[in-house]
């Protein structure tokens, strides 16, 4: 599906019954979470809450929620019509990530066509962007005027969830786009919770080293178009900007606007011109903090694990200017025990990951991130095994190839006769093909999500790999079992007489 921006996407969803509007007052404090949780579990539509109300406070802007509550809407957001078509996006990314020399004129022509399509989607700058139709400055900057959700009863504060954070490191040609949650702590400050290994945190660290004591510029886009949001969580090759990739998905070049704050403009931070709301500001210096910059204690918040996370210290982002479209829409979500939107996104993006992994490891037959595994904490891999120890090579390959899987705790590898999408078959393979001492790999002191309270220390824990493949000589000295399979002729005979057997 092609579209121009978020509003065009919503209009198309509404025409097909994929979006509904709620005109009854609903509170962003807990009530929207409960409504959206019920919608998501029933594979219901996206929803626009037209009248957000929190007690006596009435908000001027509606709230969009449950946008990515089904895999079909995720696919539509990525320019596809179905989940199956996302494999084609993965093939495109794998070709862009590691292009191969053409083996003939036909392949050369395909390579040229692909390169031209990428080139044609280079983002373009616009001078009068919609995202700057309204500007709040000075005392007008007040985040309490935005209907930010408080998702769960034990949450510490309202939480910005779909903020597209735009940063640039001091030595980077390309901007980084990332989705990081942000706790609202007062009218113009949020706590920026980013993991130490993610792009935004790396840009900030490089800035602090290269420019100690200097404010770090940040822009946050709220209500960006789906392709740009999804591009930020997709393994885009370093040679391709997320904005350019979003244009490929959307079918139209991404329009960008230069931030109004002079220091952000000087840092060449560019934001989606069609975004609903833009936050502009800095992480300010603080000589009293060991990092040299302002930090605050974040959390606790209910998270995609299904638990409240422990508190930790993260940088404070001071918002100095807010720009927006006329009649802006605030895009929000919640996270909780699966299923939630991150789990749905994981199922959809799984189809993008498969061709990328297969390009690097052709022996991989299928790859699956079960939604019960909290998006990425468990991965299942089926493979065409070729030698003893092959499964362990694949385990370490998955952990190291894409940065999305550096936090994966469990990897189970099976043969290609096992259907990964059927837990009954996976459990059968584990219980019949695994000796726990021989076939379990434990790796200690590896990067782990800060939200994983099961790890011994924050951000550092262990990983487990389970080799549930049939064992080859060298892996066992015993005669290996042969699966029971019915004679094909007998099956065909019973098929032919089945309808008459019980008459």
UniProtKB/Swiss-Prot annotation:
Alphabetical keyword list? Cell membrane, Decarboxylase, Flavoprotein, FMN, Lyase, Manganese, Membrane, Metal-binding, Ubiquinone biosynthesis
The pathway entry for this protein reads as:
Cofactor biosynthesis; ubiquinone biosynthesis
Q: Which InterPro entries match?
A: UbiD, UbiD-like_C, UbiD-like_N, UbiD_bacteria, UbiD_Rift_dom
- Top enzyme class: lyase
| Annotated cofactor note | Binds 1 prenylated FMN per subunit.
- A GO CC term? plasma membrane
Active-site residues (renumbered): 303
- Provide the binding site for Mn(2+): 176, 242
The catalysed reaction is: a 4-hydroxy-3-(all-trans-polyprenyl)benzoate + H(+) = a 2-(all-trans-polyprenyl)phenol + CO2
In its keyword annotation, does this UniProt entry include Manganese? yes
Q: What is its EC number?
A: 4.1.1.98
Binding-site positions, prenylated FMN: 179-181, 193-195, 198-199
Protein topology in the membrane:
Peripheral membrane protein
Q: Which GO terms describe its molecular function?
A: 3-octaprenyl-4-hydroxybenzoate carboxy-lyase activity; metal ion binding
Compartmental location: Cell membrane
Q: How does it assemble?
A: Homohexamer.
Say which family it is in: Belongs to the UbiD family.
Q: What does this protein do?
A: Catalyzes the decarboxylation of 3-octaprenyl-4-hydroxy benzoate to 2-octaprenylphenol, an intermediate step in ubiquinone biosynthesis.
Q: Please give the name of this protein.
A: 3-octaprenyl-4-hydroxybenzoate carboxy-lyase
Q: Which gene encodes it?
A: ubiD
């Amino acid at each position: 599906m092609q579209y121009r921006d978020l509003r065009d996407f919503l209009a198309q969803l509404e025409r097909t019954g994929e979006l509904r509007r709620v005109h009854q007052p609903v509170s962003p404090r807990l009530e929207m979470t409960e409504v959206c949780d019920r919608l998501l579990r029933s594979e219901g539509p996206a929803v626009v809450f037209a009248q957000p109300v929190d007690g006596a406070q009435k908000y001027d802007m509606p709230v969009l929620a449950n946008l990515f509550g089904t895999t079909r809407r995720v696919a539509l957001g990525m320019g596809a019509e179905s989940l199956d078509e996302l494999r084609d996006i993965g093939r495109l990314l794998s070709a862009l990530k590691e292009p191969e020399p053409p083996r003939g004129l036909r392949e050369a022509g395909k390579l040229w066509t692909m390169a031209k399509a990428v080139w044609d989607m280079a983002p373009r700058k616009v001078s009068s962007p919609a995202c700057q139709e309204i500007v709040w400055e000075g005392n007008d900057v007040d985040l309490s005027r935005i209907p930010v959700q408080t998702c769960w009863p034990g949450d510490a504060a309202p939480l910005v969830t779909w903020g597209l954070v735009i940063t640039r490191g001091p030595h980077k040609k390309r901007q980084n786009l990332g989705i990081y949650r942000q706790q609202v702590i007062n009218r113009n400050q949020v706590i920026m919770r980013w993991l130490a290994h993610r792009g935004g945190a790396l840009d900030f660290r490089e800035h602090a080293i290269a420019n100690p004591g200097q404010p770090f510029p940040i822009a946050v886009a709220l209500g960006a178009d789906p392709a740009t949001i999804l591009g930020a969580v997709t393994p885009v090759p370093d040679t391709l900007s997320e904005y350019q990739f979003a244009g490929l998905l959307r079918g139209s070049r991404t329009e960008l606007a230069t931030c109004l704050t002079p220091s952000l403009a000087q840092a060449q931070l560019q934001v989606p011109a069609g975004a609903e709301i833009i936050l502009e500001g800095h992480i300010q210096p603080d000589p009293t903090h060991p990092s040299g910059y302002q930090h605050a204690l974040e959390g606790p918040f209910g998270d995609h694990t299904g638990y409240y996370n422990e508190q930790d210290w993260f940088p404070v982002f001071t918002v100095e200017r807010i720009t927006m479209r006329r009649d802006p829409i605030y895009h929000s979500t919640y996270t909780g025990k699966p299923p939630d939107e991150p789990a749905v996104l994981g199922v959809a993006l799984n189809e993008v990951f498969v061709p990328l992994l297969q390009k690097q490891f052709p022996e991989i037959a299928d790859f699956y991130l079960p939604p019960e595994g909290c998006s990425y904490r468990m991965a299942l891999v089926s493979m065409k095994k070729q030698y003893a120890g092959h499964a362990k090579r694949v385990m370490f390959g998955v952990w190291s190839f894409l940065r999305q899987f550096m936090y994966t705790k469990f990897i189970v590898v099976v043969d290609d006769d096992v259907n990964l999408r059927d837990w009954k078959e996976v459990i059968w393979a584990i219980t019949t093909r695994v000796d726990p001492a021989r076939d379990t790999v434990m790796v200690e002191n590896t990067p782990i999500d800060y939200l994983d309270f099961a790890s011994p220390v924050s951000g550092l824990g262990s990983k487990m790999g389970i080799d549930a493949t049939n064992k080859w000589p060298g892996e066992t000295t015993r005669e290996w079992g042969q699966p029971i399979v019915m004679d094909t002729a007998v099956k065909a005979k019973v098929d032919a007489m089945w309808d008459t057997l019980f008459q």
